[in-house]
Amino acid sequence: MNSSPLDRVSLKNPVHLLALGFGSGLIRPAPGTWGSLAGTILGSALLACLGLKIFLILTALCFVLGCYLCQKTADDMGVHDHGSIVWDEFVGVFIVLASIPTLSLPWIIIAFVLFRFFDILKPYPIRYFDQKLESGFGIMVDDVLAAIYAVIVIVILRIVGLPC
């Protein structure tokens, strides 16, 4: 009998708990969207409590940790970048949240939507890296690139003076 990749992970395992976004990656359909939403909520709270400088340091640490978490969980599941692994979405949306001018609901929604748009669309070179890099770093880097695209759009919106 073949077991599902999800049968090989447990939320009691702290590595799996984090890689699966505290369980948000187990929600169907669209686990990446649910993971991004959970990351947006957590990231907004952390940014509000910690301030930008500490939040950026935490985000960088989460990226480094994520390379391990995602690789270990993918290995345990026997599947590279299984949809339920959403720590990469957390880090991606953290990066975008760090770029918004205020933690107002409109800007938070814009950050979430732009990140999901670029994470799903995967414009060049995101898709290339997503397909070619088979490691924890590879799982993480496509979401960082999607975040960079979203940040570029946010910078443009700020330059043109979007009132939020």
Question: What do the predicted segments below correspond to?
Answer:
Residues M1-S4, T102, I109-A111:
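Active-site-proximal helix-loop elements at catalytic-domain edges
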Residues A38-G51, I95-I100, I154:
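Interfacial segments of multi-pass membrane proteins
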